[in-house]
Amino acid sequence: MPKSTKPLIIFSHGNSFPGSTYGVLFQSLEARGFQIKAIEKFGHDPRYPVTSNWPNLVQQLADFASQEVEKSGQPAFLVGHSLGGFLSLMCAARHPQLGGQKVGGVLMLDSPVLGGWRAKALSVAKRARLVGSISPGAISRKRRHQWLGRDEVLAHFRSKKAFACWDEQVLRDYIDH
């Protein structure tokens, strides 16, 4: 007998967006009857170092999801944003059963899937060690990290086109976490 009747979503965040950034989304899903569990930050646990193609992060997700499935008694639906979507897909492919339950499904949100010549071009760029200079991780490493205060951070991000349409609470969660 399941320990919970609520469907279980294991959420994986995108690059530079800790799990807590998605609080508004999580609250909305919880209000609709889902359990939401998420790793707060991929790439920060020394047991799961970041390497090419993220096998350790996939294992971190599998280990986390297995524990949550065992606790809830429900199969996991793996949902991920950007990088998290890739991790979710790779996790389901490598671990179709988590915590003794078949994975319920995978949902990738804004994960740029490449195929054909684009995938081959990326593979060549990785082998030539060019990817590190143009990847989202390289871009995020160049971001400003020090501010005089929270109001300065809010003003900065509100003025950016990429953040202009963000819900106010989502922006505040992004800044706080």
Q: What are the residue ranges of the model-derived segments?
A:
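Conserved HGGG/HGGXW glycine-rich cap/lid loop of the alpha/beta-hydrolase fold
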Residues: 3-47
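Alpha/beta-hydrolase fold active-site loops
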Residues: 7, 75, 104
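Glycine-rich His-Gly loop
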Residues: 11-14, 82, 111
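Active-site signature of alpha/beta-hydrolase-fold catalytic machinery across serine-
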Residues: 24, 90-94
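Active-site loop/oxyanion-hole signature of alpha/beta-hydrolase fold enzymes
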Residues: 41-79, 93-95, 99, 113, ...
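Gly/Ala-rich beta-loop-alpha elbow adjacent to hydrolase catalytic centers
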Residues: 80-84, 88
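Flexible "cap/lid" loop of the alpha/beta hydrolase fold
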Residues: 101-145
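Alpha/beta-hydrolase
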Residues: 140, 144-177
